[in-house]
């Protein structure tokens, strides 16, 4: 499965999950890309807290969170980041980010 199809599948599953819980996804999920073309696949916004999410097809991609730091300039409350990938269990990437297996979404 190509990366674009994989991302579409994950986002579709997340959207279905929101609707299943009576929430409108467009109120919570956003895409980020700045003028330097740095992007983050999803931003989950809940009140004043933002959780950056990257979707990667491989297992434990090391550079998955390289663009999370672009959010620092906005001085917002940034929650623990997530990398949804093909790993087998939840595990930390670092102090601020966790790998989440795709089968848990």
Language model segments and positions:
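A cross-kingdom feature that marks ATP-driven nucleic-acid transaction machinery
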Residues: 1-105
């Amino acid at each position: 499965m190509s990366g674009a199809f994989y991302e579409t599948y994950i986002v579709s599953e997340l959207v279905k999950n929101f609707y299943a819980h009576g929430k409108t996804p467009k109120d919570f999920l956003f895409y980020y890309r700045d003028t330097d073309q740095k992007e983050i696949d999803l931003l989950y916004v809940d009140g004043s807290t933002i959780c950056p999410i990257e979707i990667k097809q491989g297992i434990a991609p090391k550079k998955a969170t390289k663009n999370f730091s672009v959010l620092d300039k906005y001085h917002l409350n940034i929650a623990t980041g997530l990398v949804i990938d093909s790993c087998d269990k939840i595990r930390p990437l670092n102090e601020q980010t966790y790998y989440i297996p795709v089968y848990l979404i």
